[in-house]
Amino acid sequence: MQFTQHALDGRDIILHTKGDSMSNFCYITDAVRAIIILMTQGDMGEAYNVCHDEETRSIASIANLVACHVGGDKVSVVFDIPENVSSFGYAPTVHMFLNSRKMRNLSWEPKVTMKDAYIRLAEYITEERQNG
C-alpha cells in the first residue's frame, strides 16, 4: 500500500534493500473463491497452494510496476541502501515459488493480475481521499 500511496502522491518509491525477495501473489477475491471451492471440493487434511503462478515477483519488480502503472512518468524507484543494511533488521532475502496445480485441478484459476490489483488499489485510495 505504501508504494501505491507514494506513487499517487508523485513521490519516488524508496527501497532500502535490493528488493530481491520473491514470492507468488494472489488477489483477495481470487483467494476467497479458492477457499469456497476448497470448502466444497477440497480433500480434508490436504494442503493446497492458492497463488497466481504467473505473478511471481520480487519486491523491486513490484515497486517498478507501481511506479510505472500508478505513478506514470513522474515516479521512479530509488535504491537507498545503507552501508550497514544488515543492522536494520530487514527480513532476509527469500525466494518462495508456490504451485497452484492442485487448485487448478479443482477448476480454480486466478483472474486478477498484479497490475490490475495495484490499479484497483490506487482507485480505492483516490476515492477514499476524496471522500475522507
Q: Which positions does each model-derived feature cover?
A:
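C-terminal substrate-binding subdomain of Rossmann-fold SDR/epimerase-dehydratase oxidoreductases
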Residues: 7-132
